[in-house]
Swiss-Prot record, chain B:
Keywords: Cytoplasm, Hydrolase, Nucleus, Protease, Proteasome, Threonine protease, Zymogen
Primary location class: cytoplasm
Catalytic reaction(s) noted: Cleavage of peptide bonds with very broad specificity
Residues at the active site: 40
Entry's Gene Ontology BP terms: proteolysis involved in protein catabolic process
Lineage: Eukaryota, Viridiplantae, Streptophyta, Embryophyta, Tracheophyta
Residue positions assigned to the propeptide: 1-37
Top-level taxonomic group: Eukaryota
InterPro entries tied to this protein: Ntn_hydrolases_N, Pept_T1A_subB, Proteasome_bsu_CS, Proteasome_sua/b, Proteasome_suB-type
Localization of this protein: Cytoplasm; Nucleus
Subunit structure: Component of the 20S core complex of the 26S proteasome. The 26S proteasome is composed of a core protease (CP), known as the 20S proteasome, capped at one or both ends by the 19S regulatory particle (RP/PA700). The 20S proteasome core is composed of 28 subunits that are arranged in four stacked rings, resulting in a barrel-shaped structure. The two end rings are each formed by seven alpha subunits, and the two central rings are each formed by seven beta subunits. The catalytic chamber with the active sites is on the inside of the barrel.
Gene this chain is encoded by: PBB1
Enzyme Commission (EC) number: 3.4.25.1
Name of the protein described by the UniProt record: Proteasome subunit beta type-7-A
Amino acid sequence: MTTFTVPIDNGDSVRIAEEESQRTLYPYVTGTSIVAIKYKDGVLMASDMGGSYGSTLRYKNIERVKAIGKHSLLGASGEISDFQEILRYLDELTLNDNMWDDGNSLGPKEIHNYLTRVMYNRRNKFNPLWNTLVLGGVKNGKSYLGMVSMIGVSFEDDHVATGFGNHLARPILRDEWHADLSFEDGVKLLEKCMRVLLYRDRSAINKLQIAKITEEGVTVSQPYSLKTFWEFSSFHNPTAGAEGSW
Amino acid sequence: MSQSTVDVPPKGGFSFDLCKRNDMLTQKGLKAPSFLKTGTTIVGLIFKDGVILGADTRATEGPIVADKNCEKIHYMAPNIYCCGAGTAADTEAVTDMVSSQLRLHRYQTGRDSRVITALTLLKKHLFSYQGHVSAALVLGGVDITGPHLHTIYPHGSTDTLPFATMGSGSLAAMSVFEAKYKEGLTRDEGIKLVAESICSGIFNDLGSGSNVDICVITKGNKEYLRNYMEPNPRTYVSSKGYSFTKKTEVLLTKITPLLERVEITEVGEAMEE
């Protein structure tokens, strides 16, 4: 007879009886923030290509933004294997939907709703998919941008960010985002946010992709890196005038 | 075998006697009391002629705003000011203490205080308390060797930086600095950038709020701009004003004088040997 101890919340992990060890307790390979904004023609989403294994930068070529069907982009931060699982679920969903062969296709709102249900139900069973997902898309001329977290919190907004992006990128977006940004302005704004994240998030790497979705379809850019500036005189000689300090 | 325990007065510094008891209690499940934290955004930046320090003005006690307009920029010396984040009592006490020490030092040496003196005094104190004095400080000033800006962490480590942020709103403020800081800012550009970063903390962090305080220190001159910006004014004031209950009526006035003091001189008996 398996004894079931009431799970006590201890920060990130959950203590349970040994027999039931098939639940996600903590993430292993993780992706860092995603930043996304609505712009004039659709949605822009930026992410870097790093996958960290704890404090090691293990994988430097992970695409964390994928196209879903014709109308949506899904970006994920958190556990990479759970993201791949979600992509499989969405594959099945879009395949089943295709088989109806009625000319309809799943739009971003529908996929967002599906993902919300999946994440919330998994969380209710104490077996979460350890991701924060960003869903952006355009259907029938209307752009859509939403977010689902691993506990099932879901909402829509004009600009979203996950993980560290919440603290570092959102203040910039709240100040400088406005409706009907042009493509160039949108990319500049995203790059501004990604640069701050690069300076201040330890798991960020300088290799990012920006994905764009419009009524015409999805384009994911080639990976590229941002220019950084390290030439402040105080950085060169921090103890000038304060000899012996650090 | 004599069991004499002489009470030796503690030699000063932190007394670790109760730590074992506290450990035992936490293992039994007792939660330690939490501190009044300032939940803050404090920033400093070096511009062309000196240093600009900025701070918000909200002090929180858990989820409640305890003080809507507190002062987080503390005076250390005429040419040195220090912003404090963390436990309010700790920041007040430690900056006050070092401020007095600096004053005495000024009398003794006959010279203006230097920023690294304040830095070393603070750092030594905080390190010896192993992080239990929960004060995170942004120390800035202009002395004979030039403008300086340092951050001091509760465990006693320090950084020397061109721009710095501390407190719960530090990430929001740092994102503004990282995006917009340049070297050689003028006074007005510097004040604008500091105000922008404090506002970023005020509007994006729940632990920071109310107004922006700014302090500009240059060679031989300092300006303490208390409530430089008030982006959260009270917009609704009821036009009805306050109405108290109906007039109080005086029913009775009675004055009872205190009893007269009576001196009793007793002729006591002489003490027996």
